[in-house]
């Protein structure tokens, strides 16, 4: 469909990438100037491939493309397979929750409203070719094609156990926890460098985990009538 649209005057293609592309990177915060050549999961590899395909379309057909690397999105209408949804459901059903790596990990949790706000603002920031860019000296987030990549994250990594504490406060009960080893393909920490995003659109995600988790629990209880 993208190839078809390329012949129909597409002004700007925005697409969802992921913080997962940073894979084995250890330098914090994760920067779009850093290489992302070592994914640790198939999901991460597909997101990297997504960015490569976008760049190819930008180069071949001149389609302006912007990749947005989302960092651990959560909030109302979230995916049922994500931790917050599964934890909330289990707690309200009186079941234990599975806590991986014994809770010793951090995530840059980003509330859905902040993600949407950033996307809306990015629509009008149409990337232009950078004539000074070279493979040898240029940033991976930039190109001689009309192509850009940005992080969208809260820039405040939170310990998983603190995230669970915020959920316990919102639900009004203490979770029974199954402490388990880390899952294959998981990483210990994520943290977003959002300065390029702020420079482009004057916005940084700012919803706190405590407020965002409460919003989710309020929605969950109302939607599922529990």
Language model: regions and residue ranges:
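Aromatic/hydrophobic pocket-lining residues that form π-stacking "cages" and hydrophobic walls in ligand
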Residues: 1, 54, 86-87, 164
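N-terminal Rossmann-like NAD(P)+-binding domain of SDR-like oxidoreductases, especially those catalyzing
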Residues: 1-73, 122-123, 203, 207, ...
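Active-site proximal helix/loop that lines the substrate pocket
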Residues: 18-21, 72-78, 104, 157
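Short aromatic-enriched loop/helix-cap "lid" or pocket-rim segments at secondary-structure transitions
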Residues: 26-28, 78-81, 112, 163-164
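Short-chain dehydrogenase/reductase
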Residues: 40-51, 78-85, 108-109, 157
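C-terminal substrate-binding subdomain of Rossmann-fold SDR/epimerase-dehydratase oxidoreductases
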Residues: 91-226
